[in-house]
């Protein structure tokens, strides 16, 4: 059986043997797509492996484990059905292994959503589980899709943004940096809370919150760990990665910053058996002003909701954390980063009334 090839550009027609179509996922190589590239096949026909073509059955796709499994727990993946998991694992595989084009068969969609909407829905959860899949894939025109016909069958062609070798290099550099940060945790940090405090402190104090000149093509975790600057998703992804690598179950959630009505991302993590919420980007902004209290470290659901509105798809899926690590002696909850709020924080610090700082 011959191998399929890309004809011309990415969006051009693809020649595929009819016998290789049923129940398949197709993924095209990420870099330098030309007419000589092999079409990679994923489906139930394990015989399609000639001339270097890779073949994976559906069960293999469903059973795929992340190359970076130490950085994620799959909190949201555990809440998906089989077809959603099929999409989740396919996009995760493509992202981790360097592919930009995916062809999803119609039978992986349940019909309750528009096709692209369902894919965006699943990728959103993947991006909150994995620090290596950008949150803005589905919000900054990085994701496009259209239905194409192959041998009489319909496939949804998804194109992820092509990022190239530099992206891969920065991702790996950030991963190695994360390993060294986790390895630096002092021996006296022998509980989940102490480990989390140490890592959260590292993130908040070794980065600057920036928006001007920020490119959506950046690698958020590398922006923070390598360059020392990031936006909220860089902070959240880095917390996800570091906490999980330290054995602390962590994921992130998307929503809106209440004070600015802008998109925002926060974390939740399980410390010593209890879930709490975290906003390292907000604490980093306070840190830049000369203060180091953990006003956003270990919030309850209610406290997190004072400054953050969870997106609808997260409101019923995220843990409703009841406990808080915020100091009982603090009579305000910071809901913005205005000068007045920071002034109040300074007064609390000077009075000695606030004891929930990172040390």
Language model region names:
Residues 166-224:
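Secondary-structure boundary elements
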